Structures are given as C-alpha cells and as structure tokens.
Design a protein with these regions (language model features):
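Structural detector of well-ordered beta-strand residues that form the stable sheet scaffold
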Residues: 39, 85, 113, 193, ...
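Acidic (Asp/Glu)-rich catalytic clusters
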Residues: 2, 31-32, 71-81, 101-110, ...
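Short acidic/polar active-site loop segments enriched in Thr and Asp
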Residues: 36-37, 110, 158, 252
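Short, hinge-like loop/turn segments at secondary-structure boundaries
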Residues: 56-58, 103-104, 130-131, 210-212, ...
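Divalent metal-binding pocket/active-site signature
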Residues: 20, 45, 107-185, 190-206
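An N-terminally biased module of ancient metal coordination in phosphate/nucleic-acid-related enzymes
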Residues: 1-94, 104, 166-170, 175-181, ...
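Charged catalytic cores and adjacent phosphate/nucleic-acid-binding surfaces used
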Residues: 1-12, 121, 155-156, 172-268
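Active-site gating/metal-coordination segments in enzymes
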Residues: 76-123, 128
Length: 268
C-alpha cells in the first residue's frame, strides 16, 4: 500500500480552498501517481480556533480561517467514498499541551501530525527570524531535536512530520547522535514520516536523513509516506526515492491511520 499523509488544500500563495470539490483533484492526482490513500493535513496555525496557542504577532496574524469548513470538506469527501483521511499539521508549543489537546478534541481526526516550525519566536524553516542565524547551527540542532522529542512525549500526535526539518537550508553539524530523539519517539509510540518535500528545498534530500531512519528502524518506529503537497500536481512526487530509502533501511510496512488508530500494511 502507498499512502500520502501530508498535504494542504491551501497553496502557499493562495487562499485556503474550502469547497468540497477542491478535494477531488488531489484524489485524481493520487490515483494517477499510484497512491492508494491520501490524508489532508492543513496547517493548524491558519485557523482562528488555534490562535490561543500563539503569543507572537506574526503567528496570531495568520490565524484567520474557520476550522469547521475544512473539517466538513474532508469528512464530506470521505463520506462520498473517496480514499481520504482527515488530519491536521499541528505545531508543538511547549507548555501548552493541555490547551492544544482541548482545542483539538472536538473534531473527528484520523491522525494528527506534530511539527516543529518554531522555537520560541524563532523559525526553523523560514529565512526571516531563522533559528540557526540567531543561535548558531549546533545550538539550533540541539534545540530543534530536544523540542521534537518533547513533541513525541506530549502524547498529542500520531506522527511527526519532516522530522529533521532543521537541515532545510543545508546547514549541518559535523555529526549528530539521533539516539535520544528516536528513543523518545519509540517510547511514545509515535510514527515518523518519510517526506519527499526536502528534495525541492535547498538541502535537496529526503526527510529524514538515512542515518536518522536507520536508528528509527532499529527501534521499530513506524513510518508513513508524505509529499507535503500544496497542489495536486505534487501528490506522490518522488515516491520512488522514498520507497528506495525505506527499503534500504529495512522497512516492509507502512502505517495507515483511521480514527487515530493505526495498523501496518505491506509497503508498495
């Protein structure tokens, strides 16, 4: 089975498309790409419902959409028998775990993606307010993976998206011990996604790095597949490379989510 469990109805330069019909082009693109099931995971920080989690103006200013039409659009598509799952990409905000849990509780998620795009007021993947510029590359890596481990331990998330996002601009440390963060992920029973999105970023490689994935495999961390598509033409892009990476690491199954329960299906 092939899944693509990370995509957005909102193009980065367009308004959030909320009509149910906007789901269909993604489904059609998935079928053409040989993807069996897709999951929509809009950014939580676009929704007014999650605005209370943020304190910095450049984040609260993003929270302009109602969450209900998004949920209803995906649920309606699922009700029509389309192979879609309802997810949300949620930024982990330290010390706001219970509030996050309460804000997300009313909705029928199939799974929740945990992301770390921000450390305090600094950005992991945005050139403005870039974490690595402010604290240096080694400290940025340390802070990022400490926060990712905390996200795993929070119990909020079913899977972690682009798990080594801190490398996005190709800024690296000479060596890094992935053991502690992977141990936190494994102990929490959280999956990680293998994402092809990094191939179109300055780093020009998959998320996560093969060394990271090898440690995940050694700890039996389950995996999903992801394109991080913001438009239908990106669904399933470069999945041949993702599958090659997974098989090289020894993975034979992929994680499928339904109502926040998971099961393993043969990969491919």
């Amino acid at each position: 089975m092939i899944v693509d469990y990370h995509m957005h109805l909102r193009d980065s330069k367009e308004e959030l498309a909320l009509e149910t019909l906007t789901v269909d082009p993604f489904v059609e693109a998935a079928h053409a790409a040989g993807v069996d099931e897709i999951g929509f995971t809009e950014h939580g920080y676009y929704f007014k419902h999650l605005a209370p989690l943020w304190s910095v103006p450049y984040m609260t200013e993003r929270c302009v959409y109602d969450i209900e039409p998004y949920v209803e659009a995906v649920v309606a598509a699922r009700g029509r028998g389309l192979p879609v799952k309802l997810g949300l990409e949620v930024d982990y905000v330290p010390d706001r775990e219970e509030e996050t849990r309460e804000l997300l509780a009313p909705y029928p998620w199939d799974y929740l993606l945990g992301s770390v795009h921000f450390i305090g007021e600094l950005s992991v993947d945005g050139e403005e307010f870039l974490l690595a510029d402010a604290v240096g590359v080694e400290e940025a890596w340390r802070l990022y993976f400490e926060t990712l481990a905390a996200a795993a331990r929070s119990g909020l998330f079913d899977s972690l998206s682009h798990p080594d996002l801190v490398k996005i601009f190709g800024l690296r440390v000479a060596s890094f011990d992935y053991g502690p963060v992977v141990n936190a992920i494994a102990d929490a029973g959280v999956a990680v996604e293998v994402s092809t999105a990094g191939l179109s970023k300055p780093v020009r490689e998959l998320y996560p790095h093969p060394e990271f994935l090898a440690v995940c495999r050694a700890r039996d961390v389950p995996v999903t597949l992801a394109s991080d598509a913001h438009s239908p033409d990106v669904v399933g892009r470069d999945f041949d490379q993702a599958l090659e990476l997974l098989r090289a690491a020894g993975y034979e199954t992929v994680t499928v989510f339904d109502q926040r329960r998971r099961r393993q299906e043969p990969l491919g």
